[in-house]
């Protein structure tokens, strides 16, 4: 970093890590929301729920308010060896809406949700609103349990125009989200995520905005991002491109430390591989854990 000009290698690596953390962690929280809301809207509240209440959170439900309100408070527990979470999320659902119905929309308010990576203590803090639309109808719980006569596929769309992200260097930026998540079952839940926006001529865009260096970016999914319950709901494969930076950065997920596709590493990290062209025209590759 010379005379205030950010080294592109530094920006490529740091932005990739920021976007990966934001994307994987907000999707993980969306799984929490599914778990809680699916259970809340079931007739007895006691049906088997494969997506259990988060191990690092408490849940309160106000079914008498209008709209109905669910608060998830993350308590900083180390039950997940890879990260800790604090802060709260408030989910609202109109009293006239059943979440299982096609077209139902829940509104999610992130309130100082801080996610800290255990390996290096780096954190992001998220505030803002997003909506989750149940496009297909049905409940993720029934896909997980493979209950006969119910939807075998559930599709959700997540959108936001104002997710505020504070990075560990105290810089604050606003990002936008447009993701489509498809839930199927193959030895447990499989969650396949694709971007669904078109921004500046780029298709399949999942996130866009300004990175911590103050530069615009667009992140598109070039291969679907796949999360598997059989691997503890971790991102097991996928590829994105970051554009509008000094060079297009291609990031591939689900790899080992040598950059080769691998099976689930249990409590050890997966690795991602970044490929970009530096200012001197030389293609560079960086491999990092996630």
Which residues does each PLM region occupy?
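Low-complexity, intrinsically disordered segments exposed to solvent
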Residues: 1-290
